[in-house]
């Protein structure tokens, strides 16, 4: 197994004249297949930096039962996923190929996504083949980038970071030159025709009633059923990302350009975060609409906090997060419980569950054992996913999976892929769902999906006017 050794070089710049968005606009045409990750709203010390990643060096993708390594010397390896060689083996083997030394090497790692479809590798879950060939993408894709631009949002500093092999000449000056460029190309965005869905309102309500029936029969306690929408467009979808981040600031803002397709969104929910030997899950369970009236929103938040159905769901999903972490952690506890958090169109109830990885535990396996989030599947999780695969007329693709960072040192920070667009060949796919329990009401659950999609639909309208 060949190992690739790198060292980091870096320089720090004053960042008060540069934002992540303006900088990305300057560098994206020079460095295609780049990524932007920001944080806003309810972020603290664990999430206070923004990143731009440029120039892919290597990648690991998993699709059709095979892990594909694309390596810095342009070589390619294929490794079938089997019971003896699982996804965590592939990710760990790929990470082990790279050794990075130097200051800020902790930022060097794999940036990308795990789609909901990846559940097929972790449990006995059938996944429908895509009926839209243009929406095909690997089940998992993570990229190691040569350059990182790191924004310290508290200090107004920019860090430029480059990974170099022995004998390689630095080109960090070219990155800095691009950042200082005052001109960049602007493109329009325009939606074409109406938004469509494979499901009508009545068909989705019928699905909800089927979910309620499964809860009443005792097949599941809760099941999360979703609905997909599609919108044709022309122009620059980055303008849509800008509109979405303005309308719906969230802890996880991201725009990934993977070449043939892009994934971008504004997610409020941490799927899993591992720092050192500490792991965290932040389940969101409980949603109500914002009205724009502060007094009414406060009343809605109090009703949400006290509603027996919402509380029962929240307790169930906090317990599921505890169980997920307990598979690889000890000292599992609830750090905060049922905190009310306000977003542009909705109010959420949020808790945090944490644990300490056992000495023998593998961080990647711990991450996989939490996938997918209970808040996007249900409880019991495996049975809920089996029913989701049967009831939803399409596979979920990126929706309900996760997106973010896997460090070469075993750290990771992954957001749940919700409030998100997938863009390919002039079509946007976006999706939302809600947790169904025995006492659910089909009309209310339909409205909850519409509430969650409110920010995305408003962003489309706003992007056309920018």
Please provide the spans of the model-predicted regions.
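Extended alpha-helical targeting/anchoring segments
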Residues: 1-466
């Amino acid at each position: 197994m060949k190992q690739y050794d790198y060292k980091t070089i870096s320089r720090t710049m004053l960042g008060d004249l540069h934002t992540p968005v303006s900088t990305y606009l300057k560098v994206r045409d020079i460095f295609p297949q780049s990524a932007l990750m920001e944080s806003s709203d309810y972020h603290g010390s664990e999430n206070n930096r923004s990143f731009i990643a440029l120039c892919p060096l290597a990648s690991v993708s998993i699709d059709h039962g095979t892990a594909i390594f694309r390596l810095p010397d342009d070589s390619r390896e294929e490794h079938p996923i089997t019971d003896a060689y699982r996804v965590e083996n592939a990710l760990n083997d790929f990470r082990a190929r790279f050794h990075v030394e130097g200051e800020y090497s902790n930022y060097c790692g794999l940036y990308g996504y795990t789609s909901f479809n990846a559940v097929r590798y972790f449990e006995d879950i059938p996944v429908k083949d895509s009926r839209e060939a243009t929406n095909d993408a690997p089940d998992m894709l993570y990229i190691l980038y040569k350059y990182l631009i790191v924004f310290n949002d508290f200090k107004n500093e920019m860090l430029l970071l480059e990974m170099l092999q022995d004998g390689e000449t630095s080109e960090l000056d070219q990155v800095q030159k691009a950042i200082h460029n005052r001109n960049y190309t602007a493109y329009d965005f325009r939606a074409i025709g109406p938004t469509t869905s494979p499901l009508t309102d009545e068909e989705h309500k019928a699905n909800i009633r089927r979910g309620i029936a499964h809860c009443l029969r005792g097949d599941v306690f809760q099941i999360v059923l979703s609905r997909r929408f599609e919108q044709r467009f022309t122009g620059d979808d980055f303008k849509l990302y800008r509109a979405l981040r303005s309308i719906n600031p969230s802890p996880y803002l991201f725009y990934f350009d993977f070449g043939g397709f892009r994934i971008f969104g504004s997610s409020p929910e941490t799927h899993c975060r591992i720092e050192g030997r500490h792991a965290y899950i932040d389940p969101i369970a409980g949603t109500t609409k914002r009205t724009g009236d502060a007094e009414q929103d406060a009343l809605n938040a109090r009703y949400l906090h006290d509603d027996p159905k919402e509380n029962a769901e929240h307790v169930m999903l906090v317990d599921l997060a505890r169980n997920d972490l307990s598979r690889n952690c000890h000292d599992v506890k609830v750090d905060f419980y049922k905190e009310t958090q306000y977003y542009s169109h909705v109010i959420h109830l949020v808790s945090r569950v944490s644990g300490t990885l056992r000495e023998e535990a593998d961080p990647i396996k711990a991450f996989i054992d939490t996938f997918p989030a209970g808040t996007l599947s249900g409880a019991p999780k495996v049975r809920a996913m089996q029913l989701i695969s049967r009831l939803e007329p399409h596979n979920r693709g990126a929706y309900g999976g996760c997106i973010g960072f896997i460090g070469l040192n075993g750290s990771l920070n992954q957001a749940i892929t919700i409030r998100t667009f997938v863009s390919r060949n002039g079509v946007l796919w976006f999706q939302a769902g809600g947790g169904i329990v025995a006492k659910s009401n089909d009309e209310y659950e339909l409205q909850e999906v519409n509430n969650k999609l409110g920010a995305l639909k408003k962003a489309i309208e706003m992007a056309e006017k920018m």
